[in-house]
Amino acid sequence: MKTRIHVVQGDITKLAVDVIVNAANPSLMGGGGVDGAIHRAAGPALLDACLKVRQQQGDCPTGHAVITLAGDLPAKAVVHTVGPVWRGGEQNEDQLLQDAYLNSLRLVAANSYTSVAFPAISTGVYGYPRAAAAEIAVKTVSEFITRHALPEQVYFVCYDEENAHLYERLLTQQGDE
């Protein structure tokens, strides 16, 4: 797994990967944080694609994921997943966050994409504690890629240095980097 999981500090919208994962809200209509940044960088085509998904299925439930085109992003597709709002850890948040990562990975693999970039899902306005969220992310992705050929490359894209070090430390502890 050493060559399959990477930590990058920077702007997820600039990454030339097959799939960028968006930490979306249930409406898929964009919002703040990484969701807003992805929608702004992708342009109106992404919003149009999200509107079509909403017309077909309504809101995207927490823990679920949908895939759309990427608009003006360098990626080929965007997987929109809805992570849980942190409510103290007693509302099944851990399982819902794991599901958000797993369902995203399943869509990437099912569509034969080889590379994917994840933000730190639910750690912004949704308030999930960063360390706990990173542990779930690293564990879930590591377990998935040991059992599946795709995606070949997974990137954890961290906005700041502190979060990047957190992911690097967790990957080192697991022997993945």
From Swiss-Prot:
Residues 1-175 form the Macro domain. It is an enzyme of class 3 (hydrolase). Changing residue 40 to A: Causes a 17-fold increase in the dissociation constant of the YmdB-RNase III interaction. InterPro entries: Macro_dom (IPR002589), Macro_dom-like (IPR043472), O-Ac-ADP-ribose_deAcase (IPR024900). Changing residue 126 to A: Loss of activity. The keyword Metal-binding does not apply. SMART domains: A1pp (SM00506). It catalyses: 3''-O-acetyl-ADP-D-ribose + H2O = ADP-D-ribose + acetate + H(+); 2''-O-acetyl-ADP-D-ribose + H2O = ADP-D-ribose + acetate + H(+). Its EC number is 3.1.1.106. Induction: Expression is induced by both entry into stationary phase, via RpoS, and cold-shock stress. It comes from the Bacteria. One of its GO terms (molecular function) is purine nucleoside binding. The active site is at 35 (proton acceptor). Keywords: Hydrolase, Stress response. Substrate binds at residues 11-12, 25, 33-35, 122-126. SUPFAM superfamilies: Macro domain-like. Changing residue 124 to E: Abolishes enzyme activity. One of its GO terms (biological process) is purine nucleoside metabolic process. Homodimer. Interacts with RNase III. Interaction with the ribonuclease decreases homodimer formation. Deacetylates O-acetyl-ADP ribose to yield ADP-ribose and free acetate. Down-regulates ribonuclease 3 (RNase III) activity. Acts by interacting directly with the region of the ribonuclease that is required for dimerization/activation. Overexpression inhibits biofilm formation via an RNase III-independent pathway. This inhibition is RpoS-dependent. Overexpression also results in increased susceptibility to apramycin. Belongs to the MacroD-type family. YmdB subfamily. This is O-acetyl-ADP-ribose deacetylase. It comes from Escherichia coli (strain K12).
